[in-house]
A protein has these predicted regions:
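Non-heme Fe(II) oxygenase metal-center motifs and adjacent flexible, charged/small-residue loops
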Residues: 1-167
Length: 167
């Protein structure tokens, strides 16, 4: 796992405002409702047990701001996923599905009030059996074929993920 950047407070505010404007749908994974809401651009991968289906969604280029973030952090990405987790949300240890290429770029956004020092709570992210505390606005790149998880959240969170569908 590698930190690419930590967004400035102004950039975080702009991205949070953008997230609030997105229409999110409840995620269904292997036929079950999950703790997350989602929205896809480019290509969506839907999973049902050992099968995956890839669907076209609105083009990434249909949103100039989103397209600029893709070009900045993972220009080859053809699939972007926005997740919202509520307090208590979690995702167990897993490897991402084979329909994706290995590398993922993720922007972590914490939807909670800052403390007196202007800092928001961190998000625990477990990757490769090590715990990391992701800051609000932290941009990371990681290999999704290494076990990773998000333990039970203490604050709501957005996760904006850039990926490439494997050819």
């Amino acid at each position: 796992m590698k930190t690419l950047e930590i967004l400035s407070p102004v950039e975080c505010d702009r991205l949070m405002s953008w997230c609030y404007q997105q229409e999110l749908n409840h995620e269904i994974f292997t036929g079950q409702l999950t703790c997350r809401k989602q929205r896809w651009w480019g290509f969506e991968a839907e999973f049902y047990f050992n099968r995956s289906h890839v669907y076209e969604r609105p083009p990434i280029e249909s949103d100039a701001y989103l397209s600029s973030l893709r070009d900045r952090y993972q220009p080859e990405a053809n699939s972007i996923l926005l997740y919202r987790y509520e307090v208590g949300g979690t995702i167990g240890e897993h490897l991402d599905k084979q329909c994706f290429e290995e590398m993922v770029t993720l922007i972590n956004l914490v939807d909670d009030l800052p403390n007196l020092f202007g800092q928001r709570p961190t998000t625990r992210f477990r990757w490769g059996r090590q715990n990391y505390e992701l800051e609000h606005g932290q941009v990371i790149a990681f290999n999704s074929r290494v076990l990773h998880s998000v333990p039970k959240l203490k604050s709501p969170r957005y996760s904006l993920q850039f990926r490439r569908i494997a050819q």
